[in-house]
Amino acid sequence: MAKFPEAEARIFNKLICMKCNARNPPDATKCRKCGYKGLRPKAREPRGG
């Protein structure tokens, strides 16, 4: 998706909270906003249509 690897790492190297959708750093264990422990990696492929 990104044009070069550095940009791809900057864009996709994040975790997303599954409760409040906040962006979190890649080494987080819980959400910075709500404290929820359910974090997923940011999707590299677009979903839906």
Curated annotation (Swiss-Prot):
Protein source organism: Methanopyrus kandleri (strain AV19 / DSM 6324 / JCM 9639 / NBRC 100938)
Annotated family: Belongs to the eukaryotic ribosomal protein eL40 family.
Molecular function in Gene Ontology: structural constituent of ribosome
Signal peptide positions on this chain: none
Cystine bridges: none
Transmembrane segments: none
Entries under HAMAP family matching the protein: Ribosomal_eL40 (MF_00788)
Protein's UniProt name: Large ribosomal subunit protein eL40
Keywords: Ribonucleoprotein, Ribosomal protein
GO biological process, one term: translation
GO CC annotations, alphabetized: ribonucleoprotein complex; ribosome
One Pfam family of this chain: Ribosomal_L40e
